[in-house]
Amino acid sequence: MDVEWNGLDTLVVAAGVSALQPLLAIAGVEVENKTELEMTTQEGIQNTVDVAAAATRGNYVGPLVAAVTFVPLLSNTSKSPSILLVNSLASVIPAPTRTLYASTKAASLVLYQALSIEHPNIAFTFFMPATVEGDFRASAVDSGPVRELDPNAHGLKREDVAKRCIDATDNGEKAVFMPVHMRFGHLLYWVWPAFVERAARRKYNFGV
């Protein structure tokens, strides 16, 4: 690749898969507005394991393979190497119905954060947008329904997200939230978690 591409300056890691159901719903147990839960079955547990494996492959193993493949090339061929990880706000602010999605995206975020310490010669940017317009949810590994407001009507515009990604990478920004005020939402979770959890339930129309 270093011969064919003449090296690499910037790596963008943006691939991923969605998951849209509460964790126990994947196992076949309805949890919303229930005071007593059914017991999970062997089939339901196995389905959860299979769905979790698919989410992990897309959201964690994929970025891991990208890092192992391209970090040496970046380090050896670029005078100013950089990596942009397009992650999700759900990786730092927990969301109902996004249990598997959020946890696997959080895993890849911490992976790259640790990697940035191991490779200080590479400029890392961790991009965490809120809901973005488009059909990304069609990739859901659990075939769950979209509960929040129509992403194409209320989500961030793809062109705006792409421009912000480019600017953040060019400027060497580390942790980038979009919209920017969501940075305070992340901090607020540690100060007033009940408020953030109520807002998350409203956004995802869960138990409200």
Where are these regions (language model features)?
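Alpha-helical segment proximal to the catalytic Tyr-Lys
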Residues: 72-76, 113, 117-118
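Residue(s) in the substrate-gating loop at a strand-loop-helix junction
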Residues: 88
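Active-site loop-to-helix junction immediately N-terminal to the catalytic Tyr of the SDR YXXXK motif
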Residues: 94-102, 114
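SDR active-site lid
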Residues: 110, 116-180
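Active-site helix of classical SDR
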Residues: 67, 104
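A short helix-coil junction within the Rossmann-fold of NAD(P)-dependent oxidoreductases
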Residues: 4-5, 21-22, 69-79
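Conserved mid-core segment of classical short-chain dehydrogenase/reductases
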Residues: 17-53, 97
